[in-house]
C-alpha cells in the first residue's frame, strides 16, 4: 500500500513538472497560430479595399 502512495506522489510531481515545461512549446504554437490569423485578417482587409476600388472604377467607367 505504501508503494501505491509513493507511486501516485511521484506521478503527480512528474505531471506537474512536465506540465510546466510543456507550456513553452504550446505557447510558441499559439503565437504562430495568432500570427497566421493576423496575417489573414490584414490580407482580407487589404483585399476588400482593392475590391472596393475596382468596384468604384467600374461604376465610374459605366457612367
Swiss-Prot record:
It is found in: Secreted. GO terms for cellular component: extracellular space. It comes from the Eukaryota. Coiled coil: none annotated. Its main location: secreted. InterPro entries: Cecropin, Cecropin_insect. GO terms for biological process: antibacterial humoral response; defense response to Gram-negative bacterium; defense response to Gram-positive bacterium; innate immune response. The modification Arginine amide is found at residue 62. Keywords: Amidation, Antibiotic, Antimicrobial, Immunity, Innate immunity, Secreted, Signal. It holds the Pfam family Cecropin. Residues 1-23 form the signal peptide. Belongs to the cecropin family. PANTHER family: CECROPIN-A1-RELATED. Cecropins have lytic and antibacterial activity against several Gram-positive and Gram-negative bacteria. This is Cecropin-2. It comes from Drosophila virilis (Fruit fly).
